[in-house]
C-alpha cells in the first residue's frame, strides 16, 4: 500500500481508543499503548515540527482513557514510560548523549530484554524515506508515517523483538545535530555497530524488503500493515561455529575475520585490528606497566596478566583436570596439561618436524634453527634463546635460591635441581623404571633415567657431534669449545665450566662432607665418592673367590688375595720369558 509523502501533524500519528476499547486492554497492552504514543511524540519532537502539542496533552489523553490520577502527572508519566523503556529496551533516553553515558549498562539490559521479552500483538505500517546519503538537516528529512496499534484478537501478529533499540536509531540519528559527532563515534565504537548500517537495515524492514521471514502465530488480516520484523533464529559463524543471537550481528561479526589491521605500531611496524591491542603492544616498547599488584608491588603491562599473577598470592586454582584432578591457576595451563593425557602435540616445527605440547616450547625450539637469542643478561651481556634460561642465569649473579627442599631445608636455584635432590630422601616415588626398578618422584626424571638403558642421546653437539643424555650435559660440554667458565669461586677466584664442579670445589673451603655412609658413618664431599665406597658394603660378605679354590669371607681379604695372585702371575710370566730367551 503506497503512502503519501509529506509533512504531518501529531494527529496523524495519534492512536485513539474508545472508553470501551480501553477497558478491554490488559496492563501490558496499556503499557504498550503509552510506549508507542510517547515514541511517536518524541519522533516528531526531534524533527522540530510546529504542530506538536505539549506533553501535558498526551497526559490528558491518558486520563481520558481511565488512567489513575498518579499517571496523570506529567513528571510521573514521563518517568513511568521512560524508565519502563529503559528497563525493557536498554535505552535511558532518546537523547544520544544520555544513551552514550549509560552505555555500561547497555549490554546487560539488552540480554535481559531478549530473554524476558514476550510476544506482543502489533500491527504497524511505517514507511521511511530518509536515505543515508542525505544531509542531516531538517529540510531533507521527510517521513510518511502512520502508525496504528490494534490489540484485537482477530487481527494481530506475534513477533520476537530481536533488536529492542532498532526503532530508536532513527531518533538517535536525528539528534546528531544536538549531540555532536563525537558522541556518535563513541556510540558506534562502544556497541561495535554502525548507525548508518543499522538505519539502512531498518529502512529495509519498514519498506517491506523481506530480509527475514516472518514467523506468525496467527496471521494478520491486514497483512500489508505488518512490518517484516526479524524472527529469533540462530546465526552461526561459519569459521568458528559461534552462535550469534542477533541476525544483524552475524554480518558484523563476520567482518572480524577479514578486518583490516589498520592500527600500526610506529616502532616495529606490527599491525592490529583493534586500537586496544595496539595500546597493549606499545607498552612493550615503552616499558610502561600501569597494573600493579597490591601485595608485592610487581607491575604488569596488561590487566589480565595482573589477574593471573594475583592467584599466586591467593592460591586460587579454579581450573581442574577431569582426568587426574590436578588444579591449575590458568585455563591455558590446564589445556597444556590435558595434552599430556591425550598425547596431542599440535605445535610442529617446520624445519625438523618436531612437535610440542605448548606454543612457547615451539618458539624456543625454533631459535635453535635460527640462532636467535633475544634474552640478554644486563650483568654479563650473555644472551639466551629462552626467557626461562635467562631467569635461571640471573640467579648466578643474585645468589637467589627459591626452590627449597621440605625434608632438609636445602635450597636450589632451579626446580630441576630440587627434583633431583628429592630423590635422595625416602618417600613416595610413583614413577618406577621397568628395567632396574629405580623409582623417581617425577616422570621427567624417569624419562632421563631410561635413556641410560636405551642408549638414547638426543642432545648433540654442533661442533664435534658428541651426544648426551641430558641437555645440561650438552651445555657443559659446549663450554669446552668456547672456553667459557661462568661459575667462579668467591673464595679463591677459581672458575669452572659447570656448576656442579664449583659446588664440589666449595666444599674444600667449607670442609663440608654431606654424603654419609649409612653402614659405617664415613662421610664424603662428593656423591660419586660415596657411591664408590658403598660398593665395599654391597659386596656379599660370604662371597667366594675361586681363583685357587680359596674361600674368602671378607672383602679386605679378597683384595689382598687378588694382589698376591696378580704378583704370582707376573713372576711366572717373567720366568717363562727368561727360559724362552735362553733357548734361542
Curated annotation (Swiss-Prot):
Zinc-finger ranges (C2H2-type): 263-285, 291-313, 319-341, 347-369, 375-397, 403-425, 431-453, 459-481, 487-509, 515-537
Main location, first listed in the record: nucleus
UniProt GO molecular function: DNA-binding transcription factor activity, RNA polymerase II-specific; RNA polymerase II cis-regulatory region sequence-specific DNA binding; zinc ion binding
Alphabetical list of InterPro entries matching this protein: KRAB, KRAB_dom_sf, Krueppel_C2H2_ZnFinger, Znf_C2H2_sf, Znf_C2H2_type
Cellular localization per UniProt: Nucleus
Limits of the KRAB domain: 8-90
A single cellular component GO annotation: nucleus
SMART domains: KRAB, ZnF_C2H2
Keywords on record: DNA-binding, Metal-binding, Nucleus, Repeat, Transcription, Transcription regulation, Zinc, Zinc-finger
GO biological process, one term: regulation of transcription by RNA polymerase II
Family label: Belongs to the krueppel C2H2-type zinc-finger protein family.
Record's function text: May be involved in transcriptional regulation.
Name the record gives this protein: Zinc finger protein 677
Organism annotation: Homo sapiens
Organism phylogeny: Eukaryota, Metazoa, Chordata, Craniata, Vertebrata
Amino acid at each position: 500500500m503506497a503512502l503519501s509523502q509529506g509533512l504531518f501533524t501529531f494527529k496523524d500519528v495519534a492512536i485513539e481508543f474508545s472508553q470501551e476499547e480501553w477497558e478491554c486492554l490488559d496492563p501490558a497492552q496499556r503499557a504498550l499503548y503509552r510506549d508507542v504514543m510517547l515514541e511517536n511524540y518524541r519522533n516528531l519532537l526531534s524533527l522540530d515540527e510546529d504542530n506538536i502539542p505539549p506533553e501535558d496533552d498526551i497526559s490528558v489523553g491518558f486520563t481520558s482513557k481511565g488512567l489513575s490520577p498518579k499517571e496523570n502527572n506529567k513528571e510521573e508519566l514521563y518517568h513511568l514510560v521512560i524508565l519502563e523503556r529503559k528497563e525493557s529496551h536498554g535505552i535511558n533516553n532518546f537523547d544520544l548523549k544520555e544513551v552514550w553515558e549509560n552505555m555500561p549498562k547497555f549490554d546487560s539490559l539488552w540480554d535481559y530484554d531478549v530473554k524476558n521479552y514476550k510476544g506482543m500483538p502489533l500491527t504497524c505500517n511505517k514507511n521511511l524515506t530518509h536515505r543515508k546519503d542525505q544531509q542531516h538537516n531538517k529540510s531533507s528529512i521527510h517521513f510518511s508515517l502512520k502508525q496504528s496499534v490494534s490489540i484485537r484478537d482477530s487481527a494481530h501478529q506475534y513477533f520476537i523483538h530481536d533488536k529492542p533499540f532498532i526503532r530508536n536509531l532513527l531518533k538517535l540519528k536525528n539528534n546528531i545535530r544536538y549531540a555532536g559527532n563525537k558522541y556518535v563515534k563513541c556510540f558506534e565504537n562502544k556497541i561495535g555497530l554502525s548507525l548508518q548500517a543499522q538505519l539502512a537495515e531498518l529502512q529495509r524492514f519498514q519498506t517491506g524488503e523481506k530480509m527475514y521471514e516472518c514467523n506468525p502465530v496467527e496471521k494478520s488480516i491486514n497483512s500489508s500493515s505488518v512490518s517484516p520484523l526479524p524472527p529469533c533464529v540462530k546465526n552461526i559463524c561459519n569459521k568458528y561455529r559461534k552462535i550469534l543471537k542477533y541476525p544483524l550481528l552475524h554480518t558484523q561479526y563476520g567482518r572480524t575475520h577479514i578486518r583490516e589491521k589498520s592500527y600500526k605500531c610506529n616502532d616495529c611496524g606490527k599491525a592490529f585490528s583493534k586500537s586496544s591491542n595496539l595500546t597493549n603492544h606499545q607498552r612493550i616498547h615503552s616499558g610502561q606497566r600501569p597494573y600493579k599488584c597490591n601485595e608485592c608491588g610487581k607491575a604488569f603491562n596488561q590487566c589480565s596478566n595482573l589477574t593471573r599473577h594475583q592467584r599466586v598470592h591467593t592460591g586460587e586454582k579454579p581450573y581442574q583436570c577431569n582426568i587426574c584432578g590436578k588444579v591449575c591457576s590458568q585455563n591455558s595451563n590446564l589445556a597444556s596439561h590435558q595434552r599430556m593425557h591425550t598425547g596431542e602435540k599440535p605445535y610442529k616445527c617446520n624445519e625438523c618436524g618436531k612437535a610440542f605440547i605448548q606454543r612457547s616450547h615451539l618458539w624456543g625450539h625454533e631459535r635453535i634453527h635460527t640462532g636467535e637469542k633475544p634474552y640478554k643478561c644486563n650483568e654479563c651481556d650473555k644472551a639466551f634463546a629462552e626467557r626461562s634460561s635467562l631467569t635461571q642465569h640471573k640467579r648466578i649473579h643474585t645468589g637467589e635460591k627459591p626452590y627449597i627442599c621440605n625434608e632438609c631445608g636445602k635450597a636450589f636455584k632451579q626446580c630441576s635441581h630440587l627434583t633431583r635432590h628429592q630423590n635422595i630422601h625416602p618417600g613416595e616415588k610413583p614413577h618406577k623404571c621397568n628395567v632396574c626398578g629405580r623409582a623417581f618422584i617425577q616422570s621427567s626424571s624417569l624419562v632421563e633415567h631410561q635413556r641410560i638403558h636405551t642408549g638414547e642421546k638426543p642432545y648433540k653437539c654442533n661442533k664435534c657431534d658428541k651426544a648426551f643424555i641430558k641437555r645440561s650435559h650438552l651445555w657443559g660440554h659446549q663450554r669446552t669449545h668456547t672456553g667459557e667458565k661462568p661459575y667462579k669461586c668467591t673464595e679463591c677466584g677459581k672458575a669452572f665450566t659447570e656448576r656442579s664442579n664449583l659446588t664440589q670445589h666449595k666444599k674444600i673451603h667449607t670442609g663440608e662432607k654431606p654424603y654419609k655412609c649409612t653402614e659405617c658413618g664415613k662421610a664424603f664431599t662428593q656423591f660419586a665418592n660415596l657411591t664408590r665406597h658403598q660398593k665395599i658394603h654391597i659386596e656379599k660378605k660370604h662371597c667366594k673367590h675361586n681363583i685357587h679354590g680359596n674361600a674368602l669371607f671378607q672383602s679386605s681379604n679378597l683384595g689382598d688375595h687378588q694382589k698376591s695372585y696378580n704378583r704370582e702371575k707376573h713372576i711366572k710370566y717373567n720366568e717363562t720369558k727368561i727360559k724362552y730367551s735362553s733357548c734361542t
